[in-house]
């Protein structure tokens, strides 16, 4: 699950924990919750029969020096009653006083916020700042440590500082949408940055080339799709409904744009579709950013794309481009990645969906029918395919690592992909009666 849509997962484990048999499954497999999600997902078990075990499990991890367990632990708060109550639950499970538990959390949490709270900006190593913190505190770094921060940003292009030391971004936990967030955080001082743009504003007057951090982050993204053998064409939703926030300040549009640019960048440079993508619009057209930076590509994504989610128009555009390029069957995309909130235009005509009709034209032109991956960025309940539909995948969340798992299998249907995704986890089967839960 990672940094994806958490609410559904938390609702499910809360529901299971309130069932006698479901609670046994939760207790037996508690360790998978922070592994698949985050440590604070355990708070979904507060108020259930699994609460005590969850707090003890979390407290032990903190006492054992687990940094992520400490990072996501609730802090005491005078203004937030719920947070204070959760802090007390956790520190009681640890058997510690409030003062000692706060010290333990501080000792185990080496995060940039600690230095900022002490006004010790000079101690911050910007090459180690996580991507989310880089976007969140960009302006604070400029305000309190502009000289060192600018030196680091300028050195990013060369990869070394004036003393010859390596300079890089922290890519340990980095997703394409983080690069989008960093880009617009870096432009916030202009007064026409992310917040206005994501709600339909335009920011064409901004010099995107100055966003060195976002470009460096994008270049540092891992290759999540190596070895899959897939040629992916992103079809990205840019409609008004994509402005919805899906996690904190991250919008569905951030996810769509980040994934689209990432996938188009991973296609081989000798392929005619390298660094090309299609945004949904009334008149879809292929956008190329082959010789440009990530930040310039974002500007291209932003310029002039509004309106409908017309899948058929996008499919026709890809086919026309393939014919214009003289692309062979080994060059044309074999996977169409539709990144959307699934709020499509009316999709039926003569009992055939827009996608089916569009793909029939590909076959008529002599090309092999591609696989279709629907990536639901907003968690809406639109389902463009049934679970047994061949050559179709339904996925959601934020991480492109999902693609490698999806594209690596031979049986390409929603149910087969689900089963493949969970088969590596050795689930502990508790000793419960063999009857349905609920």
Regions found by a protein language model. Give the residues of each.
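Long lumenal/extracellular ectodomains of secretory and single-pass membrane proteins
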Residues: 1-255, 265-438
């Amino acid at each position: 699950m990672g940094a994806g849509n958490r609410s559904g997962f938390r609702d499910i484990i809360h529901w299971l924990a309130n069932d006698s048999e479901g609670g046994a499954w939760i207790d037996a497999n508690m360790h998978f919750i922070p592994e698949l999600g985050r440590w604070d997902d355990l708070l979904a078990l507060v108020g259930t029969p699994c609460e005590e075990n969850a707090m003890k499990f979390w407290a032990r991890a903190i006492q054992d020096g687990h940094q992520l367990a400490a990072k996501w632990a609730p802090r005491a708060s005078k203004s937030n009653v719920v947070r204070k109550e959760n802090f007390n639950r956790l520190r009681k499970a640890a058997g510690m006083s409030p003062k000692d538990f706060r010290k333990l959390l501080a000792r185990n949490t080496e995060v940039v916020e600690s230095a900022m709270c002490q006004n010790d900006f000079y101690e911050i190593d910007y090459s180690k700042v996580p991507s989310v913190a880089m976007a969140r505190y960009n302006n604070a770094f400029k305000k309190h440590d502009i000289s060192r921060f600018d030196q680091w940003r300028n050195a990013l292009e060369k990869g070394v500082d004036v003393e010859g030391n390596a300079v890089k971004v922290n890519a340990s936990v980095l997703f394409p949408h983080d690069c989008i967030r960093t880009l617009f955080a870096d432009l916030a001082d202009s007064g026409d940055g992310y917040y206005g743009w994501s709600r339909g504003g335009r920011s064409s007057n901004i010099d995107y080339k100055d966003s060195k951090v976002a470009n460096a982050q994008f270049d540092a993204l891992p290759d999540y799709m190596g070895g899959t053998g897939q040629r992916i064409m992103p079809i990205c939703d840019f409609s008004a409904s994509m402005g919805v926030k899906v996690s904190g300040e991250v919008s569905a549009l951030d996810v769509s744009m980040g994934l689209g640019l990432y996938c188009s960048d991973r296609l081989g440079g000798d392929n005619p579709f390298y660094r090309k993508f299609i945004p949904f619009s009334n008149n879809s057209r292929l956008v190329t950013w082959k010789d440009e930076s990530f930040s310039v590509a974002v500007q291209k994504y932003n310029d002039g794309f509004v309106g409908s989610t017309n899948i058929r128009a996008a499919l026709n555009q890809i086919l026309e481009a393939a014919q214009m390029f003289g692309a062979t069957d080994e060059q044309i995309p074999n996977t169409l990645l539709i990144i959307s909130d699934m709020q499509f235009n009316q999709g039926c005509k003569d009992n055939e969906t827009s996608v089916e009709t569009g793909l029939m034209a590909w076959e008529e032109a002599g090309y092999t029918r591609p696989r279709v991956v629907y990536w639901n960025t907003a968690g809406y309940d639109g389902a463009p395919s049934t679970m047994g539909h061949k050559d179709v995948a339904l996925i959601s969340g934020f991480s492109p690592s999902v693609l490698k798992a999806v594209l690596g299998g031979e049986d390409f249907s929603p149910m087969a992909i689900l089963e493949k995704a969970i088969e590596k986890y050795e689930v502990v089967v508790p000793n419960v009666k063999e009857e349905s839960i609920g």
